[in-house]
A protein has these predicted regions:
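Sparse, context-dependent recognition of short Cys/His-centered cofactor- or disulfide-binding micro-motifs
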Residues: 3, 55, 139
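Compact, glycine/acidic-enriched structural inserts
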Residues: 23-81, 85
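Amphipathic, interaction-prone secondary-structure segments
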Residues: 1-18, 23
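A eukaryote-biased signal for long
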Residues: 76-166
């Protein structure tokens, strides 16, 4: 997920478990600030997920773009992170709190807050609630979320993801 402002996060689901990485381009832990990945962020990523750390999709011109990293193997009882000495004076030094906020708070209200900030347009909360409840899409709901689209415009996308439609 890229926000268009230089920040991103990725989640890799693999047979061994799940690998999550985030990159906050304004973080004091940015590899562009520190001339490389901040110590501890990826140092203890297990072998099962090393290919994710080294994946070119998660780098920019050879620089691994990561400020936050966690993983969970299928055998782990909880999520794991590296041992990191975070920089002082920063409330969210790696950006994890805000990078992953929609993964933690999946409420319609949280999404509307994100969407209004990101797209800089009003977003209809009732329509977002409709979608989050997986109720069948209607023309009214689609138009409330995007006046330039109709339900017919989205038919192929809706069918492709198996979302219910009227």
């Amino acid at each position: 997920m890229r926000n268009g402002s230089g920040d991103e996060h990725s989640i890799v689901f693999a047979p061994a478990g799940v690998y999550v990485r985030g990159f906050d381009h304004e973080s004091p832990m940015s590899p562009y600030v520190e001339d490389g990945v901040w110590p501890g962020v990826v140092d203890s990523v297990p072998e099962e997920f090393r290919s994710c750390v080294e994946d070119p999709a998660f780098s920019d011109d050879g620089v691994t773009t990561v400020t936050a990293c966690l993983w969970r193997r299928t055998t782990d009882e909880s999520w794991q992170t590296g041992e990191i000495d975070f920089p002082e004076g920063h409330v969210d030094p790696d950006g994890a709190d805000w990078l992953f906020d929609l993964l933690v708070d999946r409420s319609p209200e949280a999404y509307v807050s994100f969407a209004v900030d990101y797209y800089e347009v009003p977003v209809d909360l009732d329509s977002v609630r409709h979608v989050c409840a997986l109720r069948p899409l209607t023309d009214d709901v689609v138009r409330a979320l995007n006046t330039e689209l109709t339900l017919a415009d989205l038919a192929e996308d809706i069918a492709g993801i198996g979302y219910p439609a009227t």
